[in-house]
Amino acid sequence: IDMTVGTSYTAVGEALSAGSADIGFISGGNYVLFSDDCDVLLTALRYAINKDSENPADWNDGTIEENTKDMSTYYRCIILAGPSEKGQELQAKVNAGEELTWDDLNSATWSVLSPTSASGYIYPCLWLQDHYGKGISDLEHVVQSDSHTTSVARLAAGQVDVMVSFGHIRIKNAPKWETELGGTAPMVEQTGVIGVTEGIYNDMIAYSKNSDTMADENFRKALGESFIEIADTDEGREIISVFSQVGYTWGQDSDYDGERAAQELLKSLEG
């Protein structure tokens, strides 16, 4: 076995594309850039949270999300409304089972991150496009924050009505919502989910289509099974924890179609 450390996910993708590497650990975003020359072997598993519904009202059950020991191949992003009058209005509508209109969302002030942020911009933008045929750039009131924590603080202070982030954002911030972030009541009482994106698949182990070694399907199967078994040991879990991964399962190219849509959106924004 000859192992090298890539200087970046892009460098790993280039090595797979050239056939100078047989397999590589790579992000979904970089995979779709090089998927003509590589394919998915395994998708990484991470610990899931206890809420996974695409119906936002299901998240508003009076409890903060919790980490579980269940493993998942993906995570979701959420659109979170806060304690402002408009934020509460949007939450009430969702919890009553009503569909939010574009005018509802456009009347709110949003906090987003930079356009390269997956959970802070790209996937919430795709959610808007899927549901309303519009994007974040079409919203009239948008504030760009430098971090998810800044977005949460602005939400708590009522400076914005809505923020976008990863699905476990409240787990991290609920303990300091009142003490550090400016909330006036528990976070679970002052915030509510009003939108949930499709699942965003985790990083992967990809193999090169230009590798003679990986051309053998039986070898690929044996190699994949080896990684799955290694990750199922204490020593293996410790090694892959550097990637925040807890295991592997078989993956397929179509799992990353959402990432392809994200890359197309990114290209259009940069264009």
Can you say where each PLM-predicted feature lies in the sequence?
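Short loop segments at secondary-structure junctions
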Residues: 3, 82-87, 209-213
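An extracytoplasmic/periplasmic, membrane-proximal ligand-sensing/linker region
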Residues: 217-271
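Surface-exposed patches in mature extracellular/periplasmic domains of secreted proteins
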Residues: 2-6, 136, 141-142, 235-242
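A conserved helix-loop-strand patch within extracytoplasmic ligand-binding domains
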Residues: 45-118
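Periplasmic-binding protein-like
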Residues: 43-78, 180-221, 241, 245-247
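Extracytoplasmic/secreted proteins, especially bacterial periplasmic and envelope-associated proteins
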Residues: 11, 15, 20, 29-33, ...
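Pocket-lining segment of extracytoplasmic ligand-binding domains
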Residues: 94, 98-101, 106-216
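Beta->alpha turn/N-cap motifs
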Residues: 5-9, 19-32, 36-38, 42-48, ...
